């Protein structure tokens, strides 16, 4: 027998003494749900007793091909017997049965992703015991039919719609509108119907444990078998599609496994003094300090999140007849939990005939807006300190605050309203299924997923959609919780929308308007409204709580007490981006890609320079480019007055500025067919020959970067002259321009040395011409492994290093980014060959090259500064490594990633202090 403990108890014994064996620190052992059930038990909250099967058991079971580890089943049987003794009831007992729930619980919160079974232990005998115990036949038969339905779907994979259709038919026959109006006799008949559905749709060969009658499997009668199959199903659900999608989205390892929680049932469906609900200690949408959530009278827990019936607000619980005392106790529990966890808590509870039971708590998911407000107010309340507040905000979540909103200056009329379930606005075409959402999105269409209510199988469509709209469900429904977690705008509970997914239409109560697939609508998840047609959207502004958190973050990241500050710059190619980045808190420009200034109308000018044989034409093109580029730099440097602006010389191969040769070939053929003159055709053919002559077989490793400065020096030197001239003129105007020139794609020290000599000569010429002393640093962009290896040599001749981690990743791996991401990186990640996409999160080997180059450069030239301007400069995970492992001075990212980078840089500083 294994020495590994696989089962942990929680709750009290028959005498009320706590026998809990775990606590909240054990989430990797017991899963988040199990650890928090143990913690609530330890602090004296009312928790139904139970036991937790460890995550490691799931890992070993799955890893062995769904074979139980040695001794595991024996421990589970012993835990069952212990729970029966504690509760004074027995599973399957015909007089006073113990019923249990079986729930998953991963180490990290995965709301709605995993499967649950309630009322396990019911069979034809124990249902009679439940009737005798409760004197409530309707409740007993309702519990039994729910169990068969859940067990058949979750454990055996029977289509849930088969049961819903039978339930609908039962309502029609009985002449009632809702399930709660069905009689005990109706429900007893439904139990037999559900058993028949089970027998007709379960393959006996797949489940040799099941009894077979007339070739059909019989619904399992033995509670021991029910429990074992349910636990195995929860283990199996860890690798189902929707769980894998969620983990991939949130960076959760597939190798953690899930725990299983077996817990005595508390019934919220025992009549009008019973209820079930989901609540938060604060508002998870905006952070308001108020009790927030939904409850349903005479219902079971899954009814709330499934959105089957519209819920009541938690504030009404204290005034609901028969539930007043439980409502008051729940508010006291809210305060206890928040004080204990020092965070907003998400709670599931059941009230059984006036008695409150806590079924779950966890640190609650929240919108970015709510996260900021809660963190700030908890600092003000003395629950946490500023550093902890900064550490609690997920940098990636700040993207939510930058989501578009409806343009307030434009008029629009709401077609319908619902609940403001997840903030932000979205515009898109109506689609009615997850598959259609994915298909249309892949074709380049923006879509709004419109559903009666979502379920976990809709996740891929929710990910693909710009926004989500449901006609049912509350603010804690599946749609609301998942949308908030993804930062996707969502409006729930739009009751005027009567959705017919089969016909793909929405009929709107009180309106003649009928929405069909492909119609465009706009939704505002902040206001909870739906608008017919497209509404203009505007970007959100950084104000209020975000400014407060980011100001705290800046204080932390710019602190030089324990080393250099963690600076944040921006990649900006025009004054508009630069100005926006300053609003977002960028300190300087870390990368200005000058080639972007040659696009649009200016493309013809650079094409004249590249393709012409006439030296006069080439020089005129250079003069024209010098003029427009000088104007660009004047605007850029003026915007960034007093701040560094790193200007990268021309980097891409020249053919990127030319026409596509194959498209030009087609155009020539068409002109020939149309009878164009030989003179016109000759010009085009000459152009095609020149372009073909410039095509390289591997252009990204060809004539580009510093190699252009060596082979075709006129173009990059024109850029140096433009930058120096702009700086000189601004100095004379009293502006403080601070340009820095960066030489790209250097791999050989002599490349940089020779290019720097020419750059300095041009700067000196401009200084004399303009009568202004210029001091423009010249640095190197390290994008190749060889450059990192000889960084100490290059550092003798460079004022700074900036790492282009996009190309450094390509050349370290030997990957072509576009090809790799399109063709095999997703497969590599699926097969766990790669943990992350190395173009999104910096690879350890690439990070080591950066670290080594920084170390070499700093040893040679202690006054150098070091930065990163690749995509990794905006990735929170990469930012921590770049500062704490590679020891760079700054990261540079796109304007909209600047707030995220500021926060991540502060968190990197805090992490470094903790590990010092």
Residue locations for each model-derived region?
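Short, ordered loop/turn segments at secondary-structure junctions
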Residues: 52, 56-58, 454, 473-475, ...
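Nucleotide/phosphate-binding sheet-loop regions of phosphoryl- and nucleotidyl-transfer enzymes
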Residues: 1-413, 439, 445-448, 455-460, ...
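Short, compositionally biased
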Residues: 382, 531-551
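Conserved alpha/beta-domain cores
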Residues: 103-104, 542, 554-916
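Short alpha-helix capping/helix-loop boundary micro-motifs
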Residues: 336, 504-511
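Intrinsically disordered, low-complexity regulatory segments
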Residues: 435, 495-497, 547-553, 573-575
């Amino acid at each position: 027998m294994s020495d590994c403990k696989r089962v942990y108890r929680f709750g009290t014994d028959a005498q009320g003494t706590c026998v809990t064996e775990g606590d909240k620190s054990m989430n990797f052992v017991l899963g988040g749900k199990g650890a928090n059930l143990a913690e609530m038990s330890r602090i004296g909250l009312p928790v139904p007793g139970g036991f937790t099967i460890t995550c490691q058991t799931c890992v070993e079971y799955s890893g062995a091909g769904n074979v139980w580890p040695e001794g595991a089943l024996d421990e589970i049987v012993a835990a069952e017997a212990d729970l029966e003794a504690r509760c004074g009831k027995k599973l399957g007992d015909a007089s006073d049965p113990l019923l249990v729930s079986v729930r998953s619980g991963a180490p990290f919160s995965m709301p709605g992703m995993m499967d649950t079974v309630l009322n396990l232990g019911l069979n034809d005998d124990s249902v009679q015991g439940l009737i005798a115990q409760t004197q409530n036949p309707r409740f007993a038969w309702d519990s039994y039919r729910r169990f068969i339905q859940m067990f058949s779907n979750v454990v055996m994979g029977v289509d849930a719609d088969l049961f819903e259709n039978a339930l609908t038919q039962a309502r029609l026959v009985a002449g009632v509108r809702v399930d709660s109006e069905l009689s005990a006799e109706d429900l007893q008949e439904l139990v037999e119907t559900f058993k028949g559905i089970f027998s007709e749709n379960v393959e006996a060969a797949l489940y040799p444990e099941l009894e077979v009658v007339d070739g059909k499997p019989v619904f399992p009668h033995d509670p021991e078998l029910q429990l074992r199959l349910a636990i195995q199903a929860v283990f199996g659900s860890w690798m189902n599609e929707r769980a894998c999608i969620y983990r991939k989205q949130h960076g959760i390892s597939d190798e953690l496994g899930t725990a299983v929680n077996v817990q005595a049932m508390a019934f919220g469906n025992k009549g009008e003094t019973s209820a079930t609900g989901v609540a938060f200690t604060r508002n998870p949408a905006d952070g308001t300090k108020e009790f927030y959530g939904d409850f349903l009278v005479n219902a079971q827990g899954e009814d709330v999140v499934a959105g089957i019936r519209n819920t009541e607000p938690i504030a009404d619980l204290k005034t609901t007849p028969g539930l007043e005392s439980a409502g008051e106790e729940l508010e006291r529990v809210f305060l206890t939990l928040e004080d204990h966890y020092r965070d907003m808590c998400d709670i599931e509870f059941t009230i059984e005939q006036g008695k409150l039971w806590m079924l779950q708590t966890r640190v609650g998911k929240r919108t970015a807006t709510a996260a900021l407000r809660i963190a700030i107010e908890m600092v003000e309340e003395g629950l946490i300190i500023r550093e902890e507040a900064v550490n609690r905000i997920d940098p990636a979540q700040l993207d939510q605050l930058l989501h578009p909103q409806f343009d307030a200056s434009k008029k629009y009329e709401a077609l319908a309203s619902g609940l403001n379930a997840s903030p932000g606005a979205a515009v898109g075409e109506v689609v009615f299924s997850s598959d259609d959402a994915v298909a249309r999105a892949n074709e380049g269409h923006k879509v709004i997923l419109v559903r009666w209510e979502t379920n976990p199988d809709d996740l891929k469509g929710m990910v693909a959609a710009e926004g989500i709209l449901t006609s049912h469900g509350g603010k804690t429904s599946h749609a609301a919780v998942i949308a908030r977690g993804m930062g996707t705008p969502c409006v729930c509970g739009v009751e005027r929308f009567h959705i017919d997914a089969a016909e793909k239409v929405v009929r709107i109560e009180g309106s003649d308007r009928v929405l069909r697939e492909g119609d465009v609508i706009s939704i505002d998840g902040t206001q909870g409204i739906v608008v017919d047609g497209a509404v203009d959207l505007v970007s959100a502004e950084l104000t209020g709580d975000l400014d407060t958190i980011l100001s705290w973050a800046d204080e932390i990241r710019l602190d030089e007490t324990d080393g250099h500050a963690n600076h944040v710059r921006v990649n900006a190619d025009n004054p508009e981006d630069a100005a926006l980045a300053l609003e977002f808190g960028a300190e300087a420009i870390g990368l200005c890609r000058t080639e972007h200034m040659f696009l649009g109308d200016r493309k013809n000018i650079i094409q004249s320079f590249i393709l012409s044989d006439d030296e006069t034409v080439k020089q005129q093109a250079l003069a024209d480019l010098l003029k427009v580029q000088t104007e660009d730099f004047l605007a850029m440097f003026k915007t960034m007055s007093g701040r560094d602006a790193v200007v990268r010389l021309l980097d891409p191969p020249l053919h990127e500025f030319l026409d596509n040769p194959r498209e030009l070939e087609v155009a020539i053929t068409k002109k020939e067919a149309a009878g164009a003159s030989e003179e016109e055709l000759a010009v085009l053919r000459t152009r095609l020959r020149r372009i073909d002559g410039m095509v390289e077989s591997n252009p990204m490793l060809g004539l580009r970067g510093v190699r252009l400065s060596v082979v075709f020096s006129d173009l990059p030197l024109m850029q140096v002259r433009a930058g120096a001239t702009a700086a000189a003129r601004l100095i004379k105007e009293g502006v403080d321009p601070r340009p820095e020139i960066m030489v790209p794609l250097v791999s050989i020290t002599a490349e940089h040395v020779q290019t720097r000599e020419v750059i300095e000569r041009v700067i000196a010429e401009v200084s004399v011409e303009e009568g202004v002393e210029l001091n423009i640093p010249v640095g190197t962009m390290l994008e190749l492994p060889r450059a990192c290896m000889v960084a100490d040599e290059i550092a003798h001749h460079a004022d700074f290093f900036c790492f282009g981690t996009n190309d450094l990743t390509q050349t370290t791996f030997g990957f072509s980014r576009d090809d790799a991401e399109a063709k095999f990186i997703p497969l590599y990640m699926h097969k766990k060959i790669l943990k992350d996409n190395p173009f999104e999160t910096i690879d350890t080997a690439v990070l080591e090259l950066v670290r080594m180059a920084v170390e070499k450069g700093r040893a040679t030239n202690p006054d150098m500064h070091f930065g990163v301007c690749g995509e990794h400069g905006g990735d929170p995970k990469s930012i921590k490594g770049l500062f704490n492992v590679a020891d760079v001075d700054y990261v540079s990212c796109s304007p909209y990633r600047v707030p995220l980078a500021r926060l991540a840089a502060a968190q990197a500083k805090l992490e470094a202090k903790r590990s010092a």
